[in-house]
Amino acid sequence: MSNIWSKEETLWSFALYGTAVGAGTLFLPIQLGSAGAVVLFITALVAWPLTYWPHKALCQFILSSKTSAGEGITGAVTHYYGKKIGNLITTLYFIAFFVVVLIYAVAITNSLTEQLAKHMVIDLRIRMLVSLGVVLILNLIFLMGRHATIRVMGFLVFPLIAYFLFLSIYLVGSWQPDLLTTQVEFNQNTLHQIWISIPVMVFAFSHTPIISTFAIDRREKYGEHAMDKCKKIMKVAYLIICISVLFFVFSCLLSIPPSYIEAAKEEGVTILSALSMLPNAPAWLSISGIIVAVVAMSKSFLGTYFGVIEGATEVVKTTLQQVGVKKSRAFNRALSIMLVSLITFIVCCINPNAISMIYAISGPLIAMILFIMPTLSTYLIPALKPWRSIGNLITLIVGILCVSVMFFS
């Protein structure tokens, strides 16, 4: 049996699942619910290939490069395109996931202020205090160290997955099929909704940061056979991810009237908040919903924050060197944490709409790295020509459509 499927492959499947399913899963039903049933059904059809193809392409891109042990995306880009393009991709990578951190922080703040609003009037002063508390607490957890934080995150994965599955099954009793069947119409607005929903889908299913670690680990163990091992794990993991996420999305949208989804979208909160808004929502759902939403987004925040701080440290180091100042790595890192925290606090106070940030900034930037860079490279780099395929071409086209939302939406 171990020759067919090993314990290690099971652990990596859980790692991919735990990284992919989280805060993004809570935003996907909001966008798809407001976009209409046609967009929902199309998403269900394309979810697996548009999760598998881009992550597989990125894995191939990393594994095909002749880089030093332990080098991931940045090393691969530098190998193929040189140091300048490598630095550009590193900066783009930093910006893309810095925006993700901002989205999670804003959504956590909104979820907490929404609960406080039931007991008091929320003005700017209260929002500033909540924003400050969110930023400070998340930083305190982060400063516990990488290993301690990862242990906490790993401990939270299974309860979160169990909650999503339990809630999906629980809501089956409240399904109202007419909530979807009455929305089935295809017109010009449907095409527009499909277009602007692409970045949210990219955001929800993306787990780009772990792909470098995954590819490097497989290469160290299997060498030239690493890609076959990666594809084997990805096919199974992404099938489970897509089935469970789509079951959760359909279960929510078959239970929640569109007006509540629109209200949640306007407030910049997750689908769990939309569920708690329902008149007949049980008390346990409101309480557990806010806890799970905050925990899921905090887990995703911390998982992304490590990479953001590392990227910010490099940006600070380069900037200081350009003005003739050379400081220790500890100083650069401390300054990075302070600057990132300050910007996060300010954005939480301003309260931009989370969904709008996803489809206007975060989704398109992630698409540049995940959908466009590895697939376009198969047409630009002769050594990558064997990886050209219909799947890669479709991934490239979807990536370009996703990026176009940033400029034309």
Curated annotation (Swiss-Prot):
One MF annotation (Gene Ontology) recorded for this entry: transmembrane transporter activity
Main location: membrane
Keyword Secreted: no
Transmembrane segments annotated in the record for this chain: 26-46, 88-108, 128-148, 152-172, 194-214, 236-256, 277-297, 330-350, 354-374, 389-409
Residue intervals on the Cytoplasmic side: 47-87, 149-151, 215-235, 298-329, 375-388
Compartments, as annotated in UniProt: Cell inner membrane
Membrane topology: Multi-pass membrane protein
Periplasmic membrane side: 1-25, 109-127, 173-193, 257-276, 351-353
GO BP field: amino acid transmembrane transport; amino acid transport
Gene Ontology cellular-component annotations: plasma membrane
Keywords: Cell inner membrane, Cell membrane, Membrane, Transmembrane, Transmembrane helix, Transport
Homology family: Belongs to the amino acid/polyamine transporter 2 family. SdaC/TdcC subfamily.
Protein name: Inner membrane transport protein YqeG
UniProt organism field: Escherichia coli (strain K12)
